[in-house]
Amino acid sequence: MDAIILCAGKGTRLHPITESRPKPMIPIAGKPIIEHIIEKIENHVEKIYLIVGYQKEKIIDYFKDNPKIEYILQEKQLGTGHAVLTAKNFIKGDFLVLNGDVIFEDSIDEILNYENAVSLSNVDNPENFGVIELGYDNKIINLLEKPKKEEITSNLINAGIYKLQNSVFGILENLAPSERGEIELTDALKKLIENGKLHGVELKGYWNDIGHPWDVLSANNHFLNKIISKVSGKIENTVSITGNVIIEEGAVIKPNSVIEGPAIIKSGSIVGPLAYVRPNTVLMKNTFVGNSSEIKGSIIFENTKIPHLSYVGDSIIGANCNFGCNTITANLRFDDKPVIVNIKGKPVKSVRKLGAIIGDCVKTGIQVSFMPGVKIGSNSLIGANCLIDRDIEQESFVYKKDELVITKKRN
């Protein structure tokens, strides 16, 4: 049996992080979402076909040494069903299909017992997903995409993991495009439901559909709490390390720094002196957290520098960023309500604590502050003494026009 993983989409709800990488390459607990998926299935399949499109080189380069993986280009993103169809000539028998942006803990063993099956997850907000109604013997009797609250009959939703027979390709080929003009995999599933040929298997463990920045941080927190301590880097004098912490070889923790796990500090990173890394933090390769800086519950991407007197909380900071002295990310509203984030032009409630979401190659001057939930596009410059209270598009230069008044002093 082979597997197909859908990785071609742009992930626009995760801008600015996905301005520079495909969504499946966003790191969760130090490794890409798609790597977590592959680890779950690779012992069950002979080949893994990654359906790639947007920024495909990032995926291909990362997995170039894995002999099980092959790549199929979806030149135009014409729907999930169309993406699966691109693999038709490569798949000879039954196969798995997985969305490239779902992360989960359960084994896939149970779904393999059926000819056609969908993994299900029990969630608190089913209106945001495809809601599944189960009948006798785990047969699916209804699938309703993003229903109104009054239409919801179940909290079980389509978890984006499928076991399908080869005959599904024939169903997909005969589907009419949806209202969006796309070939939808869910329309093929509805055909199977009509014929009583689709089963549902409920996942009992953790599952998350990574659709928003706070989903990234939530999944990161969950999987960090599964790590086992391993300290291979250089730990200098008077360093305090508590909890489960991974410090890779080549990382350096300088004197008087405090590391509280769970946390991961990757190779080439330098922390301190007198730095504070708090729980649920990941420092990717070659990052620098300097004197009297504090990082809490955040993901700091490769080659980013947060040199001194800065605070980063509940934030995602892209690669190759450089923060000026006393750069601060606020992460909590005065009224304790969920932080509002602008997603594709609409205000969306996120979570109680959320800092800044900053793209790659952003530089800040001294004393820059970011209000909760703001997003800063890639390759932007933020001048000194700015308070950023709104989203900034990529390639922007932001500065403050304060007038400096100089007069003769009084005698």
Swiss-Prot record:
It is an enzyme of class 2 (transferase). The keyword Nucleotide-binding does not apply. Pathway: Nucleotide-sugar biosynthesis; UDP-N-acetyl-alpha-D-glucosamine biosynthesis; N-acetyl-alpha-D-glucosamine 1-phosphate from alpha-D-glucosamine 6-phosphate (route II): step 2/2; Nucleotide-sugar biosynthesis; UDP-N-acetyl-alpha-D-glucosamine biosynthesis; UDP-N-acetyl-alpha-D-glucosamine from N-acetyl-alpha-D-glucosamine 1-phosphate: step 1/1. It catalyses: N-acetyl-alpha-D-glucosamine 1-phosphate + UTP + H(+) = UDP-N-acetyl-alpha-D-glucosamine + diphosphate; alpha-D-glucosamine 1-phosphate + acetyl-CoA = N-acetyl-alpha-D-glucosamine 1-phosphate + CoA + H(+). N-acetyl-alpha-D-glucosamine 1-phosphate binds at T80, G130, N142, N158. Its EC number is 2.7.7.23, 2.3.1.157. The active site is at H308 (proton acceptor). Keywords: Acyltransferase, Multifunctional enzyme, Nucleotidyltransferase, Repeat, Transferase. In the N-terminal section; belongs to the N-acetylglucosamine-1-phosphate uridyltransferase family. In the C-terminal section; belongs to the transferase hexapeptide repeat family. This is Bifunctional protein GlmU.
